[in-house]
A protein has these predicted regions:
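PLP-dependent amino-acid enzyme catalytic core
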Residues: 1-181
Length: 181
């Protein structure tokens, strides 16, 4: 997936970078910046990444544009990621993988069960994610690396929260975006 869209601030700052970084547009950027009036602070602003996309907003959309772009560039048809049983990153990954026709597998570790965790568990299923409960965080990380090496080397692996090189590019772009705003 070659990205010739030069409208993102990072690509304006670094011409030619867009041709080397795979990206699939998933969100509407830039997101607005709003001054918080309700707190007792003179100058506190918030970047509204919750408005980044209609399907599922939030900062993970920024990361997934580049992560899933790389998965597509590599010809991967399955994405595997990890998180707690209520992971918002996992939910965003499931939603956008389904939208792009990519299978999604979530390796999940325990966390307290709250109403939002229950909601996310239902939504993973709704969006077609395969969920594997692996128990503790150490067991999940072990399963992540063993699955990759031994059982499913053809999948695209994304560490917790979309924390990889490609995901970071989305946040770097947000910094350039914020500077312009």
């Amino acid at each position: 997936v070659n990205n010739t869209d030069q409208t993102l601030p990072i690509f304006r700052e670094y011409p030619g970078l867009g041709e080397r970084l795979p990206r699939i547009p998933l969100g509407a950027f830039p997101t607005p910046v709003r001054k918080l009036e309700c707190l007792d602070c003179d100058n506190l602003w918030v970047k509204r990444d919750d408005l980044s996309a209609a399907a599922y907003g939030g900062n993970k959309v920024r990361k997934l544009e580049f992560i899933l772009g790389e998965a597509k560039r590599l010809g991967k048809r399955d994405v595997v990621t990890i998180g707690g049983i209520g992971t918002n990153h996992g939910l965003a990954t499931a939603i956008y993988c389904k939208k792009l026709g990519i299978k999604c597998t979530l390796l999940l570790f325990e966390q307290p069960v709250t109403s939002y965790v229950k909601r996310n568990l239902l939504l993973y299923r709704y969006f077609g994610a395969r969920t594997i409960f692996t128990g503790s965080l150490p067991k999940t990380v072990l399963a992540y690396f063993l699955t990759h090496r031994l059982f499913h080397p053809a999948a695209h692996y994304v560490f917790a929260g979309g924390s990889d090189v490609y995901g970071t590019v989305g946040f770097v772009n947000a910094a350039f975006e914020l500077r312009r705003q």
